[in-house]
């Protein structure tokens, strides 16, 4: 077994725009559901034991595809995957949402977050402690970012720069973190194929709550 593993990811605004939308010089008008890919990064060091924030449980996601084809509405494509993973975790662990200080999704944005809560409400779960990295990263009122931030660097930056420090300081004790991702390519979206999505979950615990590995 390795003594330590470093997990890292990043994303870049201009690169994502050029590959999946339109070149910046084109000046295309964004739809209200569109998100802004974050130029951001984050890295976590995982060890079998230590004094840091602990990982108490993990739930691997399953691919969900509800037929969303709009590349400018990624939150709607990913929300069902996040909802399905959270429901499986709560069922498997026999826990309730209110037992956690926060349930944080990766980059659903404002539109996707609303859909996420609506999907769970249909299953009888009313989330009062849900936050989304895509909604937290930018100032929705002061910046014209439409539905918020997106990209793997978005959730990595919020996790490493905001959530983990709060757990370290005991500002929070138990947090569910759901990374969200879309499974597409430059070819599939141009062919107007549907956008499958997946979401993996980790339960993070402050040092005094931990019972397992550490980050």
Tell what function each PLM region has.
Residues 12-26, 112-114, 158:
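Active-site-adjacent elements of ketosynthase-type condensing enzymes
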Residues 99-106, 176:
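Short glycine-rich phosphate-binding loop at a beta-alpha junction
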Residues 9-12, 105-108, 179-182:
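Short, well-ordered beta-to-alpha junction loops that form the rim of enzyme active sites
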Residues 1-11, 18, 43-49, 150-171:
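Active-site-proximal alpha-helical scaffold in enzymes
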Residues 1-3, 12, 16-17, 61, ...:
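Conserved catalytic cysteine-centered active-site region
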Residues 22-87, 92-95, 129-135, 141, ...:
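Condensing-enzyme catalytic core mediating Claisen C-C bond formation in acyl metabolism
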Residues 108-123, 187-194:
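Short glycine/threonine-rich loop-to-helix capping motif typified by GTGT followed
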Residues 13-18, 63-67, 184-186:
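Short, well-ordered, mixed-charge alpha-helical segments that flank or form enzyme active sites
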